[in-house]
Amino acid sequence: MGKTMAEKILSRASGEDAEAGDIVVANIDVAMVHDITGPITVQRLEEMGVERVWDPSKIVVLFDHQVPADSVEAAENHKIMREFVEEQGIEHFYDVREGVCHQVLPEKGHVRPGDVIVGADSHTCTHGALGAFATGIGSTDMAAVFATGKLWFRVPETYRVEITGELPEGVYAKDVVLKVTGEIGADGATYMAIEYHGEVVREMSVSDRMCLCNMAIEMGAKTGMVPPDEKTLEYVKKRAGTEGRPVEPDPDARYEAELTLDVSDLEPQVAKPFSPDNVVPVGEVEGIAIDQVFIGSCTNGRYEDLKVAAEVLEGEEVHDDVRLIVIPASREVYHRTLKDGVLEVLHEAGALICPPNCGPCLGGHMGVLAEGERCVATSNRNFPGRMGHRESEVYLASPATAAASAIEGEITDPRPYL
């Protein structure tokens, strides 16, 4: 019997002939913490009596959740991590200016096909878009990784998702992954690796594939993965200077479950409160009044996302009753959209453009919702209280749908604007 991508990568990293269900101890290629999970990791290391990390060149420390510091506590956490970085000689440290971890890691060449990547953040699964086995872990497990460079895994079963057909105009990767999430359900792929296949995926940019893999965790999955191809290798070689160790699933690999989705007639999708799998076509929620629109996050804060939003908003104005918050996912994205006029279009339409950060997505700052308020967001979660008050509501959508909704002051089909 052949192997899936997850089985192949964990076999290589553990030195064993690993199959789904096996328990293995794998060598870690990259370990990442941010400003919220990092201080807890440091505390656990101290409790374990560990004085030196296993390899300062394989650890990435990054600030993105509370940047600029939104409280004294956040500032103290930043200070703790800056001191830890200096003390341990951590080679890859990105302070408050660089952006959201799941955008910065691939940009800076820390994601390579075939790697085992762990991050103390649940959306680490994003990096499977480049052919890595990438998954989120807790701060205590991360402390063990910092100390030993190893971590145990139960090798996951794999859910094969094939996307066929051709995307209609006004329908994007976010609409596809929302539809997939609605089909599989919030716990339909629990602890599995989701492998994405099909001509639609092959036509997608690396950024769009990252959007697909980012929401694997919203289906309960351990990770999302896309088999590496020429686009992958071109991106990685440019960023990391190497093609990594790309693997593809064998033709006779065993899959726990399979889904084939023809997107030829797919409409823009929206996830209603209070779960990412509560997905309907935009027409079913069109006309619901909103107070805020958030375009950004590790799901949809990339260049292509902001460019689409600008295409919708060009020559238009944000509705008087709506706050449009735009947050590029990284300094690189910010710079590119600034240079080519995308941010100018968004600014002229009435958007509030913020520095790269995770703030509103986790209900931290730069866009927290009050009781009874509604937001259309391009992020990945809409649980009660996710973006602020527990009685607020979040509707998940593509950047195009979000931008059109900002113009109308209500949830809106973006296709007439394109």
Swiss-Prot record:
Keyword check for 4Fe-4S: yes
Gene Ontology terms: biological process: L-leucine biosynthetic process
Swiss-Prot/TrEMBL cofactor(s): [4Fe-4S] cluster
Gene3D superfamilies associated with the record: Aconitase, domain 3 (3.30.499.10)
UniProt-listed Enzyme Commission number(s): 4.2.1.33
Keyword annotations from UniProtKB, A to Z: 4Fe-4S, Amino-acid biosynthesis, Branched-chain amino acid biosynthesis, Iron, Iron-sulfur, Leucine biosynthesis, Lyase, Metal-binding
Identification of the protein by name: 3-isopropylmalate dehydratase large subunit 1
InterPro entries noted in UniProt: Acnase/IPM_dHydase_lsu_aba_1/3, Acoase/IPM_deHydtase_lsu_aba, Aconitase_4Fe-4S_BS, Aconitase_4Fe-4S_dom, HAcnase/IPMdehydase_lsu_prok, Homoacnase/IPMdehydase_lsu, IPM_dehydratase_rel_enz, IPMI_cat
Function: Catalyzes the isomerization between 2-isopropylmalate and 3-isopropylmalate, via the formation of 2-isopropylmaleate.
Summary of subunit composition and partner proteins: Heterodimer of LeuC and LeuD.
Native source organism of the sequence: Methanopyrus kandleri (strain AV19 / DSM 6324 / JCM 9639 / NBRC 100938)
Domain of life: Archaea
Any Pfam family: Aconitase
